[in-house]
């Protein structure tokens, strides 16, 4: 996946990566070097050799998704660059950001000519409006580098959740594909039987057409599932840094941890959920930066609503986990019962009963 033709890997700082990327594009355009695959976002010392080896192999494991998103997802890498660019252009604090807006406003004001002809007056009016807008943004801005960082961290966490959901959906669709294949096999067997019965005169032509339609429907369902699996796999691996036409191996899903479920408690977990919530963190930071009393009141209300929503979401998620756990236990019990019935039937058959 990320190995170059010499069998080595590279990780660079973001600033150096951009210099490298510029040289890389120029070299490729000139035809002087082959195209290489994506580099990791973090420098080599950010992880152990063992951790890098797991991320760089051609196997996607469920517990690697967070690391793969952080290192190789294009959106995350772009956000990291944008964050550093924001700090470079505007600074870290809200006051520094406001001052940059004021500087832009002053630049517009300085460009006004003050001439009295119609063209100059129109130009000066436009510059005045743009300068006033910059001045207003400086007065009202709630931004600082911390808010940008939290926003991008939130986006990264959401991408991890998307990757986890995609991997689960991939295996769900594989199971559905197996069921669709079994349905198609049964439909074909029924069609063959129907053809035999039609020849014997025990069914009508309409019955045969129905059997043929069942085969066609089963084939269509299977084709649709195969396309869904193909598209899902391509999008999934691109999300993690592979090309759409690569062929990484997708590892198995992790087993359910019953102890982890047993340790869940919405009441005691609420404080941690509030602490981890990015929307709440961002609004609290905006409140710290707010200067206008109306804005402060709006953010205070939003924060209170955030906390209520976090509690409701946590409780709902906990109930879904318990419901899924019950469904899993029922499915396991049913599978065990079917296995017992199969074993008993085999014993009876062996005994001639």
Where are these regions (language model features)?
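Sec-dependent N-terminal signal peptides of Gram-positive bacterial secreted proteins and lipoproteins
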Residues: 2-4, 10-38
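Short flexible linkers and secondary-structure junctions
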Residues: 3, 8, 41-165
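Surface positions of alpha-helical coiled-coils, especially the charged/polar e/g heptad sites
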Residues: 61, 68, 75, 123, ...
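Amphipathic alpha-helical coiled-coil segments
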Residues: 76-79, 81-93, 141, 148, 155, 162-177, 287-290, ...
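Charged, solvent-exposed structural "stalk/scaffold" segments
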Residues: 79, 86, 137, 175-224, ...
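Soluble, cytosolic/nucleoplasmic coiled-coil alpha-helices used as oligomeric scaffolds and tethers
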Residues: 82, 89, 96, 100-103, ...
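Short, solvent-exposed, mixed-charge loop/turn linkers that connect secondary-structure elements
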Residues: 226-268
